[in-house]
Amino acid sequence: MLYLASRSPRRQELLQRLDVPFQTLQLDVPELRAADESPDQYVQRVALEKAHAGLALVQAADPDAIVLGSDTEVVLGERVFGKPVDVDDAVAMLRALSGRTHQVLTAVVLVCAQRAPAQALVVSEVTFDTLDDAQIAAYAACGEPMGKAGAYAIQGRAERFIRHLSGSYSGVMGLPLYHTSQLLTAFGAH
């Protein structure tokens, strides 16, 4: 059985598009970046930790379990934007992204007891239009930025702010479907 180690409804929705049966695991994995950790290393480590935590949870009951872990972060320079802690934090993130190009890093990891982990790191570039204070305040107040890396949902109201995207749209949402499908096929789970 395939398990998705994620609380994200977007990842669940995206994984359903691959027509692979799976169960969702509700896990709490700390997402704290070490001082010497690059954004690439950080997102890959968190995805791997989610997958391993999920495997530890289900392996006794399902020895053939395959667990998918994923993490997405928004990066501007060396600054990593996680999920905003409140509306003011969301406003600050959106101001920083306004009129600039940032990267969205999404790591996907598959683990099981029988083989080494398989992983992919997908880097997309997103250019925001220049947003005025009223646009930022209105978007932050709508609630959509909460729980989203970088304080925006590309598939939601923020889509109108995206001037250019290079990379994986589904990766920016939280699960790059092409790369995930390739990993599942390599693992014999698709």
Swiss-Prot record:
Q: Where in the cell is it found?
A: Cytoplasm
Report the top EC class in one word: hydrolase
Entry-linked Gene3D superfamilies: 3.90.950.10
The yes or no answer to whether the keyword Cytoplasm is present is yes
Superkingdom assignment: Bacteria
CDD domains given in the database record = Maf
Alphabetic keyword roster? Cytoplasm, Hydrolase, Nucleotide metabolism
Per its UniProt record, the required cofactor names are: a divalent metal cation
Catalytic residues of the enzyme = D71
**InterPro entries, A to Z:** ITPase-like_fam (IPR029001), Maf-like (IPR003697)
Q: Name one GO biological process term.
A: nucleotide metabolic process
Q: Which reaction does it catalyse?
A: dTTP + H2O = dTMP + diphosphate + H(+); UTP + H2O = UMP + diphosphate + H(+)
Q: What is its EC number?
A: 3.6.1.9
UniProt GO MF annotations? dTTP diphosphatase activity; UTP diphosphatase activity
According to UniProt, where does the site described as Important for substrate specificity lie?
A: R10, T72, Q155
User: Which residue pairs form cystines in this protein?
Assistant: none
Q: Which Pfam families match?
A: Maf
Of the GO CC terms on this record, one is: cytoplasm
The record's comment on protein family reads: Belongs to the Maf family. YhdE subfamily.
**Described function:** Nucleoside triphosphate pyrophosphatase that hydrolyzes dTTP and UTP. May have a dual role in cell division arrest and in preventing the incorporation of modified nucleotides into cellular nucleic acids.
This protein's name:
dTTP/UTP pyrophosphatase
- Which organism encodes this protein? Xanthomonas euvesicatoria pv. vesicatoria (strain 85-10)
